[in-house]
UniProtKB/Swiss-Prot annotation:
One of its GO terms (biological process) is translation. Allows the formation of correctly charged Asn-tRNA(Asn) or Gln-tRNA(Gln) through the transamidation of misacylated Asp-tRNA(Asn) or Glu-tRNA(Gln) in organisms which lack either or both of asparaginyl-tRNA or glutaminyl-tRNA synthetases. The reaction takes place in the presence of glutamine and ATP through an activated phospho-Asp-tRNA(Asn) or phospho-Glu-tRNA(Gln). It catalyses: L-glutamyl-tRNA(Gln) + L-glutamine + ATP + H2O = L-glutaminyl-tRNA(Gln) + L-glutamate + ADP + phosphate + H(+); L-aspartyl-tRNA(Asn) + L-glutamine + ATP + H2O = L-asparaginyl-tRNA(Asn) + L-glutamate + ADP + phosphate + 2 H(+). Keywords: ATP-binding, Ligase, Nucleotide-binding, Protein biosynthesis. The gene is gatB. This is Aspartyl/glutamyl-tRNA(Asn/Gln) amidotransferase subunit B. Pfam families: GatB_N, GatB_Yqey. SMART domains: GatB_Yqey. Heterotrimer of A, B and C subunits. InterPro entries: Asn/Gln-tRNA_amidoTrfase_suB/E (IPR017959), Asn/Gln-tRNA_Trfase_suB/E_cat (IPR006075), Asn/Gln_amidotransferase (IPR018027), Asn/Gln_tRNA_amidoTrase-B-like (IPR003789), GatB (IPR004413), GatB_C_1 (IPR042114), GatB_Yqey_C_2 (IPR023168), Gln-tRNA_amidoTrfase_suB_CS (IPR017958). Its EC number is 6.3.5.-.
Length: 475
């Protein structure tokens, strides 16, 4: 029997507001424990929540960017559960009247475009954070009350790879809107995954398991891959899948049972009596819609249709707004479009990954990168020399030409000097000269390599090719 995988994702995104969802406390990451709290966050008797209008605006902006319908009337509800980092013993969320519904995003997998539906986007407050140490636990309520949006996909995802692509695209769109940093390492983007299997051709969904502790997109993919295999083996062996919550163990790559999954009835939702419903008229919707910036799909189309970039380049460059903005600014400084794309996707990304830094944490600027690329364009600097210059340019900033000169990397373009390298290579490699004369094209490449090696990569490659052909024809 063959099974079809059915996946739905629930993504929590922390909104980048200055204050919390229902209190004036700061909503900043990294403060001393319990320093960003007040009487509302601590659930003192008699205090009342006040809705953060900026958070509502940003929830609407995100929903619109995800092609969602914005509710005319939306209300808040109490989700009841007890946990030490939830001092009210309930969370203010939205149940049956979310702010956004019926959206979608398009993802690309293996060159194919697929539309993934989004059921709803609702607002809620975050809980605090518990840290367990031995026989006791520490509670930090700085995060308590931080504004969140939860984005719930339709069960349209059919593989862990599609789940990864969905998360990548969702993060990109939210980042472009400016409503969140969407940094998993800081908790401003978190994901729970629901997965079930059903026999191919069957319409009824199988029993789902919810996966938690998915702290990176790779862990989402790996957790789903493991759970896919676990459920398939269980079903093939005649077993049943229980509705349960499971935790992904990073060290083993397996999922571990946490608890039997609760249903919405277990939370005893009821309308929040201390907050009146939101009434969102057309004027408010129009005002928010006008704040939506250019989104990744629009930029991607522009890069392909107006700048002539391949679709792959456009996809990579628009994955993050940071990279896309940097690309646009670099070509505005006069750098060649394709060379800039190649450097950002290649040398720049390689440097960022190797040093575990973000682009904006380096000394690289659109201006100094454009300066280096223009030196490559006009033949002043070879690509090989550029690779030696670039790490210092990224680490210290400055001017690529100056770095090249200071390190004795100036490209050799003097014909007399180059002829010495050329003739030396020809004298030392007579067999390659014969091979070239006999029509073996690879011999030319070999000889160029020998010349570049002898000149420590500083020979002007265009002149080398020209002079080498000239000298070969004489022999």
């Amino acid at each position: 029997m063959h099974f079809e995988t059915v996946i739905g994702l629930e993504v929590h995104v922390e909104l980048k507001t200055d204050s919390k969802m229902f209190s004036p406390s700061p909503a900043h990451f990294g403060a001393e424990p319990n320093s960003n709290t007040n009487v509302i966050d601590l659930a003192y008797p008699g205090v009342l929540p006040v809705v953060n209008k900026r958070a509502v605006d940003w929830a609407m902006r995100a929903a619109m960017a995800l092609n969602m319908e914005i509710a005319t009337e939306s209300k808040f509800d109490r989700k009841n559960y007890f946990y030490p980092d939830n001092p009210k013993a309930y969370q203010i969320s939205q149940f049956d009247q979310p702010i956004g519904e019926n959206g979608y995003i398009d993802i690309e997998v293996d060159g194919e475009t697929k539309r993934i539906g989004i059921t709803r986007l609702h607002m809620e407050e975050d809980a605090g954070k518990s840290t367990h140490k031995g026989e006791y636990s520490l509670v930090d309520l700085n995060r308590q009350g931080t504004p969140l949006i939860e984005i719930v996909s339709e069960p349209d995802i059919r593989s862990p790879i599609e789940a990864y692509a969905y998360l990548e695209k969702l993060r990109s769109i939210i980042q472009y809107t400016g409503v969140s940093d969407v940094k998993m390492e800081e908790g401003s983007l978190r994901c729970d995954a629901n997965i079930s299997l059903r026999p191919y051709g069957q319409e009824k969904f199988g029993t789902k398991a919810e996966l938690k502790n998915l702290n990176s997109f790779n862990y989402v993919r790996k957790g789903l891959e493991y759970e896919e295999k676990r459920q398939e083996e269980e079903l093939l062996n005649g077993g049943e899948i229980g509705q349960e919550t499971r935790r992904f163990d990073e060290s083993t790559g397996k999922t571990i049972l946490m608890r039997v999954k609760e249903g919405s009835d277990d939370y005893r939702y009821f309308p929040e009596p201390d907050i009146v419903p939101l009434y969102i008229d057309d004027a408010w919707k129009k005002r928010v819609r006008q704040t939506i910036p250019e989104l990744p799909d629009e930029r991607k189309a522009k890069y392909v249709n107006e700048l002539g970039l391949p679709a792959y380049d456009a996809h990579v460059l628009t994955l993050t707004k940071e990279m896309s903005d940097f690309f646009e600014s670099t070509i505005e400084h006069g750098a060649d479009v394709k060379l800039t794309s190649n450097w950002l996707m290649g040398g720049v990304n390689e440097y960022l990954n190797k040093n575990q830094v973000e682009l904006l944490d380096t000394k690289l600027t659109p201006e100094n990168l454009a300066g280096m690329i223009k030196l490559i364009e006009d033949g002043t600097m070879s690509s090989k020399i550029a690779k030696k210059v670039f790490p210092e340019l990224a680490a210290k900033g400055g001017n690529a030409k100056q770095i090249m000169e200071d390190n004795g990397l100036v490209q050799i373009s003097d014909e007399a000097t180059l002829l010495k390298f050329v003739n030396e290579a020809l004298d030392n490699n007579e067999q390659s000269v014969e091979d070239y004369k006999n029509g073996k094209g690879k011999a030319m490449g070999f000889l160029v390599g020998q010349i570049m090696k002898a000149s420590k990569g500083q020979a002007n490659p265009q002149l080398v090719n020209q002079l080498l052909k000239q000298e070969l024809d004489k022999r």
